[in-house]
């Protein structure tokens, strides 16, 4: 279930939104911007809903701090306000809000905006994952996120045949904690670290299969797998066919052969 953090100082409004959204989402709440920031950093939700005017820390400041943190900068944020002037709307977008909804609002308006933002985020994750994994060596580095992911890919590929390589080793190799790497990879690609590493291994295996220079039994070990059955299972889940079928399809399409 997707997670949402609602930051709202009006108890009645907070309760209404929690009840309304609680059936479809895992909802967490906070009564002001500072509490909201703490809860967001604890939960790392899929979306944030925040009031604009709140005690201790208002929505503008909280949103700005969220966008400055690499671990939360990607999270979609909806700003709510009883004021609907253009100045507040512009300020909300300038500090990084993804949507601006004036109170009072209909439940349909809120839920539609939530669904749209979460769906857009999922599509962006897939596009980013496909782009960065297609041909890593050809990627033009555009951001710190690109640098981070490419560094991970480099370490993984350098250790594909290392039997002692694991997630802990990966994190240590880039001087980062497991928690940081997990959350960063999840935020950027939608995958867990384990899934991401497995995807890299499978893409390398597919490249070997297309070259047609090695047997499948050799390829699985060079790609970081220790079990033929597990390799076949993972490959079929990812590509929708077994390694042998993949080779046959490639042969039919490109006229090249591969011996098992």
Where are these regions (language model features)?
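Acidic, metal-coordinating helix/loop segments flanking the phosphotransfer/catalytic sites
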Residues: 29-47
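Terminal helix-turn-helix DNA-binding modules in bacterial transcription factors
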Residues: 187-226, 249-260
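Two-component/phosphorelay signaling modules centered on CheY-like receiver
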Residues: 10-28, 183, 188
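C-terminal output helix
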Residues: 105-114
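Basic/polar phosphate-binding segments, predominantly the helix-turn-helix DNA-binding elements
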Residues: 167-197, 220-242
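Receiver (REC) domain active-site loop signature in two-component systems and cognate sites
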Residues: 54
């Amino acid at each position: 279930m997707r997670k949402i953090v609602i930051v709202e100082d009006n108890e009645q409004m907070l309760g209404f939104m929690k009840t309304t959204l609680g059936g479809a989402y895992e909802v967490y709440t906070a009564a002001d911007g500072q509490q909201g920031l703490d809860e967001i950093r604890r939960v790392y939700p899929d979306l944030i809903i925040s009031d604009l005017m709140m005690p201790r820390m208002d929505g503008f400041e909280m949103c700005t701090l969220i966008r400055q943190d690499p671990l939360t900068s990607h999270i979609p944020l909806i700003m709510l306000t009883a004021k609907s002037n253009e100045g507040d709307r512009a300020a909300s977008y300038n500090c990084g809000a993804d949507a601006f909804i004036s109170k009072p609002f209909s439940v349909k308006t809120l839920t539609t905006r939530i669904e749209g933002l979460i769906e857009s985020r999922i599509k962006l994750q897939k596009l980013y994952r496909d782009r960065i994994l297609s041909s890593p060596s050809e990627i033009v580095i555009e951001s710190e996120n690109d640098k981070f992911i490419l560094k991970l890919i480099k370490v993984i590929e350098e250790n594909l045949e290392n039997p002692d390589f694991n997630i802990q080793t990966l994190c240590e190799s880039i001087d980062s904690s497991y928690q940081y790497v997990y959350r960063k990879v999840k935020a950027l690609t939608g995958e867990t670290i384990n899934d991401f590493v497995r995807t890299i291994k499978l893409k390398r295996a597919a490249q070997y299969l297309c070259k047609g220079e090695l047997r499948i039994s050799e390829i699985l070990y060079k790609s970081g797998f220790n079990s033929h059955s597990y390799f076949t299972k993972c490959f079929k889940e990812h590509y929708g066919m077994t390694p042998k079928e993949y080779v046959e399809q490639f042969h039919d399409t490109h006229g090249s052969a591969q011996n098992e």
